Amino acid sequence: LQYLLLFLLAVTLTAQHAPRSKPVTQAEVDRITREAILIDTHDDVTSRTVDGYDIAKPNTRGQTDLPRMKGFLGAEFFAVYVDASYVKDNHSANRALQMIDTVRTDIVAAHPNDFVLATTADDIIHAHEQHKIAALMGIEGGHAIEDSLRLLRDYYALGVRYMTLTHFNTNNWADAQGDATDPKVLHHGGLTPFGKDVVREMNRLGMMVDISHTADAT
């Protein structure tokens, strides 16, 4: 206890005599955010643009619109979100392709002065130099590949650069945390052999493996 009291006293005295940092001005904040490349790694606004929402208009129901993105945002990973309901009747790939198309068509092509499609780090830097927002894509939910490495490669060719192995639902090759305690769900104890093939292929392609939502075993 004696040593603890001495330690606390030393910390207190040090804090009292530490030089005060000068307040940061708004101009400094603007300079840093203008020079740095700020990257948002997940944005679900695509679930609205796919239904006709124009990202250039103020968004009163969400947090993303072009006027706010112009506040020094450098790059945006738009979510290729595929709800688990699309697994039924094998509609996951159809939905994924629609979500990819809304990024390429409704966002990038519709606003060429503000966005540029990016698939590499160099693309992001080049977009920053042009004072444009780099638009990237990440799939949310590995069921989007419909158990096909060919589809995975197709998504990569279309510009997808990361994929969450699962969303809230366990798929045919990876366990999710969202239904980990559901006795009605068939779990695999992590990744199946095919699931490991998916990860290996993602590594080979250069697609980031996102483990958000996955079970610990996965």
Predicted regions and their residues:
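Bacterial N-terminal signal peptides
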Residues: Q2-T12
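Short, intrinsically disordered, charge-balanced linker/junction segments flanking boundaries
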Residues: T14-A15, L66, T214-T218
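N-terminal hydrophobic targeting/anchoring segments and the immediately downstream early-domain regions
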Residues: Q16-L186
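Histidine/acidic residue-rich metal-binding segments in metalloenzymes
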Residues: D147-A157, D179-T218
